[in-house]
Amino acid sequence: MKVITCEIAWHNKEPVYSLDFQHGATWKIHRLASAGVDTAVRIWKLERGPDGKAIVEFLSNLARHTKAVNVVRFSPTGEILASGGDDAVILLWKMNDSKEPEQIAFQDEEEAQLNKENWTVVKTLRGHLEDVYDICWATDGNLMTSASVDNTVIIWDVSKGQKISIFNEHKSYVQGVTWDPLGQYIATLSCDRVLRIYNTQKKRVAFNISKMLSGQGPEGEARSFRMFHDDSMKSFFRRLSFTPDGSLLLTPAGCMESGENVTNTTYVFSRKHLKRPIAHLPCPGKATLAVRCCPVYFELRPVAETEKASEEPSPELVNLPYRMVFAVASEDSVLLYDTQQSFPFGYVSNIHYHTLSDISWSSDGAFLAISSTDGYCTFVTFEKGELGIPLKEKPVLSIRTPDTAKKAKNQTHQGSSPGSRSVEGTPSNRTQDPSSPCTTPSPTTQSPAPSAIKDSPSAIPAGKSPLPQPSEEKTLQPAGQNMKAPQPRRVTLNTLQTWGKTAPRRINLTPLKTDTVPNPQPNSGTAPSTEEVQPEAPGEPPEEPPELKRPRLEEREGDAQNLAPDDSSKTV
């Protein structure tokens, strides 16, 4: 492991707030994006020098933001770069393959001539009212989430450039957001000292974590302490992260109280138990502010080496058939951990004069980049095999996103009758736990079904009644077994649905039949009863429809009022 702080004016010696490596199988070079107070986003190329240290080469200057840029994040494929800043907008950049540079009014001609790559803005996402602090992509690259000073978190449809949902439960700045690699959760961390975990399918809060029990008081009462730092923490960011397989959630800015002592820490949450942390990673120095995981999976170390290295047994973060490495950045240092032990195996300090701001791993795990508000960046390089032996094949993940859930829902509705399958699917969906970690894509197609089924009774008075029609046809068929011709009329006439069910209504309507149909009186046998039904159908609508439409309109308005809160909560 070698550390070097490059003497480069990354952003005109202004504070550097964020950096991110480009991942993806199609890219042959280590491309790095950086952003800072000078309102620019810059692209760099990294190589390993003969001495094993990093060599940096400038590639492009992306000038479009009007204020400081707080975060840059490449999409999972590396094709699109998202940047968010104090101007409350998110820009989506894409590299332009054409050799002719794009005419940009935001940068000088001299700066444009220095660009070796041409990047253009393909989308501008507007929705936040204040500074954008953090961005995280979904695993499939179709969706993205952002956190802002306006206390909100927004889920974006990247292809359409539109907002899908807005989460506004936080009471203060949202300084970090991460998307579960399996697509089930979105976790946010705010300076209101609350960690909120949202369910992406239900689009609502699944867990609120803010306090932890610390034992009993002198009188036997339960004591608790706040798990996260308040707004006095000297950092704009609290960048939390899921592990690449989604098994663990790592949250910085933690504080553990033991009597009068307060220890800065990073909490570790298990996917199977998100209500409280399973472990914490203490930081001897200042508060932690960012956690980033190496994208490479490694083989487990031999048990003998683990036992020799640890004097006492580790609290065992998680029992996995592989090992994952992650870095935790505090205000003045970086600690390196893996999932096989609870204490760090690496420690980097005394590299910057001011607070650190962000960290990022290269796609092969060879580089760890560190940015600081002093205007410089540091690179930690690892030799081949220094972190461990990489797995030959990555684990296969079953990914769920709101977009795929909607598509599956539409497919089930298009390919099945609305009456039978929707009712049959309801009990099975209610018995399953949608928040269970070991879920497959098949339950996700059924997870939205309960909400649609609950809404179906309220939608019946509005004019579309898929469920009652089959049942009404079954009740009318015994009354007219020998009448095959009038059946089309009964299907098209909605006014026959109410009085055709019960016999008392037919008895009350016998005087109307004699008044409205005087001509067919000579036919008074059993056949006239069937013939009278035919002329009544066109004769009764002037009287029956007002009785049926009025309650339907009233019910429709009532249902609209009742459905308004539910729909708003789903779309938020």
Swiss-Prot record:
User: For the modification Phosphoserine, which residues carry it?
Assistant: 416, 436, 456, 465
Composition-biased stretches, type Low complexity, lie in: 431-452
Sites bearing Phosphothreonine, chain numbering: 401, 426, 440, 502, 510
Placement of WD repeats on the sequence: 11-54, 64-103, 127-166, 169-208, 228-279, 301-347, 351-392
Extract the PROSITE patterns matched here. Answer: WD_REPEATS_1 (PS00678), WD_REPEATS_2 (PS50082), WD_REPEATS_REGION (PS50294)
**Which spans does this entry mark as compositional bias, Polar residues?**
411-430, 511-529
Query: Where are the stretches annotated Disordered?
Result: 403-572
Biased-composition ranges for Basic and acidic residues? Answer: 546-559
Instruction: Could you list this entry's UniProt keywords, alphabetically sorted.
Output: Acetylation, Cell cycle, Chaperone, Chromatin regulator, Cytoplasm, DNA damage, DNA repair, DNA replication, Nucleus, Phosphoprotein, Repeat, WD repeat
Modified residues annotated as N6-acetyllysine in this record: 501
Localization per Swiss-Prot or TrEMBL: Nucleus; Cytoplasm
Q: Where is it mainly found?
A: nucleus
Q: Name one GO biological process term.
A: DNA replication-dependent chromatin assembly
CC terms in the record's Gene Ontology section:
CAF-1 complex; chromatin; cytoplasm; nucleoplasm
What does the UniProt function comment say about this protein? Answer: Acts as a component of the histone chaperone complex chromatin assembly factor 1 (CAF-1), which assembles histone octamers onto DNA during replication and repair. CAF-1 performs the first step of the nucleosome assembly process, bringing newly synthesized histones H3 and H4 to replicating DNA; histones H2A/H2B can bind to this chromatin precursor subsequent to DNA replication to complete the histone octamer.
Similarity-based family: Belongs to the WD repeat HIR1 family.
Provide the protein name: Chromatin assembly factor 1 subunit B
High-level lineage: Eukaryota, Metazoa, Chordata, Craniata, Vertebrata
The primary gene name is Chaf1b
